[in-house]
Amino acid sequence: MPARSEPYRPDASIVAELAAGAVLLHDPSGDCLLLHQRDEDRWCFAKGHVDPGESLAVAAVREIREETGFEDVRLGPELTEVSYRFYRPKTSENVYKTTVFFLAFTRERSTHAEMIFDRAQWFDLASARVRVKYPTDRRVIDAALRHRSSLGPTEDRA
């Protein structure tokens, strides 16, 4: 995980990063899993860097498994793409990061979150939208709400 970020600096060099993640829904309840990142005191989705040669879909599933401990992960449709920039003091460079988010499903409930998270909790999507810190994360949840309503009842996805 990158060190705590600072505002973008116009005088620093820039690198591009690609990440993949997901809004993970519990099947059949439809609750959304959020992970609480202790060092930044914020709720977030499972997501992370795409490894060389890895597809976005494979990266999203891998990140969910690594960050939650879940094995039963079924990837749904791509939801949206979010891009933002920030300054990383550790490397003295700006980062332009793009994260592609998917909708994903699991029947598992009990997580074994990575050490960078102090807790994981299930929320209905409306409550999750209130808990996330950034407007971009709210847009991701909005996309999940739109896609979920187009899928119909949970039983239809089996």
Residue ranges and their predicted role:
Residues 14-18, 26, 94-96:
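A short catalytic or substrate-binding loop motif that flags glycine-/basic-rich loops and adjacent residues
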Residues 30-71:
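Conserved Nudix-box catalytic region and its N-terminal flanking loop in Nudix hydrolases
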Residues 44, 96, 122:
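Short aromatic/basic micro-patch
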Residues 69-109:
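Active-site segment of metal-dependent pyrophosphate-handling enzymes
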Residues 101-103, 111-144:
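NUDIX/MutT-family hydrolases
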